[in-house]
Amino acid sequence: MKKLLILNGVMGAGKSHFIKENKLEDFTLSSDELRIKMAGFDMSENGLVISQKKDRQVWSTLYTILETRMEMGLFTVVDAMHLRTRDFKKYKELADLYGYGIYVKRFDVTIDELLQRNAERESYNQISVDVIVKKFEVFTNQVLPDYVTVIN
């Protein structure tokens, strides 16, 4: 069966590190990389941050590229947080259409570890502490859809 791997975790949980460590860059679609390419950076009180201004276009583009890859039967990894159950809906539609299994790699990291990693990031890639805490709470309470297979 053809495989779609969805990475699932809060910012700083190790998703991008996992991609590099496993040499998956050529198979990966990253919402943050598309944000940088489309909208660049914004200035915040702490310096540069990845712009969220074109988020709708970012996701439209990501889904277009993903569908093209799935039409061709290619293994694909999607690097984004995927914190809400509804975040998986489009993947389900495409998986059903093209005969893919959906696999989810969860990055379950403590809040202390997330905050430490955030502090060590480049300034443009840092997130405010309150945002990390909120995203962590959402992740902790998340129920994944029953049509995905969780892998370790």
What is each stretch, according to the model?
Residues 1-8, 13-17, 21, 25-27, ...:
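Conserved GTP-binding G-domain of TRAFAC-class P-loop NTPases and closely related GTPase folds
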Residues 33, 82-86, 109-110:
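Short beta->alpha linker loops
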Residues 41, 84, 91-92, 113, ...:
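Charge-rich, low-complexity amphipathic helices
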Residues 1, 25, 49, 53, ...:
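Short N-terminal micro-motifs specific to bacterial/archaeal maturation
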Residues 11-13, 35-36, 83:
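Short, catalytically relevant binding-site loops at active-site mouths
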Residues 16-74, 113-116:
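Conserved substrate/cofactor phosphate-moiety recognition/catalytic segment
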Residues 52-102:
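Glycine-rich phosphate-binding loop used to anchor ATP phosphates in small-molecule kinases
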